[in-house]
């Protein structure tokens, strides 16, 4: 087995062993202003545990609006709320009982996409238009060496999914109709030996506006950002300063998000040294071309993060197995919430409607 493939599988195994998107801000319940930012900084978030209806480990979450959110996890599990989390409807996709849905993209109360990870045919994309009552298999990977980690969407019908490199090439796929997926790997820079991403929260990809997209990588190679400004027709690769290149192939970028076309944040770490506070957070002000280190996340390796709103606030919420924390200033300072353990992913629709998910079916609503 090639070293890169073995390291990628080892990193996936580490994630499994630890127990191991296009957000809609069109309907915030109040305007986002500097006063609101100051108020949020003073009082911090309100965190409310909710009942998910499942005990499966939840790894993906997408907040569509203040009422609708979708989550996904192991054992082919998904769940959806249409009332702000007061109730959740959980289910298992037929035929996917052995799969891990590491990413979910909600469109509405009725429509969503799920992505499962794994080598070969375990990497799949499912789609529902009836609230999860039935699911169509849209894509099933046929390359035994490809491993799809996450996806991101610009619109309900336009998105892309990332696979780790195979023989120096990233077999990224794209949909322009919400039904079929085409390989656009020739549009991307060459993959470095041993370069891959981490499927820790379904947020190794991000999409913003109508055409901008980003992919965060790591593994045995450098931790790079792959970026497009034209909907995936062309991509460029940019270096980042976070921890990377660990010989075990378990370090790099785990999660990335953008609040506008230029300003974004990424985070990650090293799975082998998961609890160590390393250079694990960086931010950009030029669309991902250059990155500067921010204050390290206080609980070690970051699995997922999200801006509280895509409408302008620099506030960020980040989660890890060792604790969660939020920053009012894009990573300059972190406010710790150490009592919340084993969380994998977080997503906000607006400052009043965010959710984080984790082990044993945990869901917590977050409101600033």
Tell what function each PLM region has.
Residues 1-10:
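Bacterial N-terminal signal peptides that target proteins for export
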Residues 10-16:
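Hydrophobic helical h-region of N-terminal Sec-dependent signal peptides
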Residues 20-21:
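C-terminal motif of bacterial Sec signal peptides marking the signal peptidase cleavage site
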Residues 24:
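Short, conserved catalytic or interaction motifs in soluble domains
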Residues 32-368:
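Residue-level hotspots at or immediately adjacent to binding/recognition sites across diverse folds
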């Amino acid at each position: 087995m090639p070293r890169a493939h073995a390291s990628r599988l080892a990193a996936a195994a580490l994630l499994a062993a630890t127990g191991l998107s296009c957000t809609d801000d069109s309907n915030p319940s109040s305007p986002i202003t500097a006063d609101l930012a100051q108020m949020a900084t003073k009082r911090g978030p309100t965190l409310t545990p909710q009942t998910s209806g499942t005990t499966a480990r939840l790894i993906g979450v997408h907040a569509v609006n203040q009422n609708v959110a979708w989550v996904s996890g192991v054992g082919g599990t998904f769940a959806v709320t249409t009332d702000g989390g007061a109730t959740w409807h959980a289910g298992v996709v037929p035929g996917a009982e052995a799969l891990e849905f590491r990413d979910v993209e909600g469109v509405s109360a009725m429509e969503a996409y799920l992505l499962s990870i794994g080598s070969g045919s375990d990497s799949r994309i499912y789609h529902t238009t009836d609230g999860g009552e039935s699911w169509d298999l849209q894509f099933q990977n046929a390359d035994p060496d490809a491993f799809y980690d996450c996806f991101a969407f610009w619109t309900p019908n336009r998105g892309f999914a990332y696979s780790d490199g195979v023989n120096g090439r990233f077999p990224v796929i794209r949909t322009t109709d919400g039904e079929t997926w085409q390989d656009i790997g020739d549009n991307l820079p060459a993959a470095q030996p041993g370069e891959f991403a981490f499927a820790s929260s379904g947020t190794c990809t991000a999409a913003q506006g109508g055409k901008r997209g980003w992919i965060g990588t790591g593994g045995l190679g450098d931790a790079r950002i792959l970026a497009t400004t034209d909907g995936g027709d062309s991509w460029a690769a940019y270096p980042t300063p976070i921890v990377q290149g660990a010989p075990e192939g378990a370090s790099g970028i785990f999660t990335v998000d953008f609040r506008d076309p230029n300003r974004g944040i990424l985070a990650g770490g090293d799975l082998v040294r998961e609890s160590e506070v390393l250079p694990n957070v960086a931010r950009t002000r030029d669309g991902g071309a250059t990155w500067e280190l921010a204050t390290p996340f206080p609980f070690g390796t970051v699995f997922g993060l999200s801006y509280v709103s895509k409408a302008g606030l620099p506030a960020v919420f980040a989660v890890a197995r060792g604790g969660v924390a939020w920053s009012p200033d894009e990573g300059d300072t972190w406010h710790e919430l150490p009592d919340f353990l084993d969380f994998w992913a977080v997503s906000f629709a607006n400052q009043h409607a965010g959710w984080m998910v984790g082990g044993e079916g945990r869901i917590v609503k977050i409101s600033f």
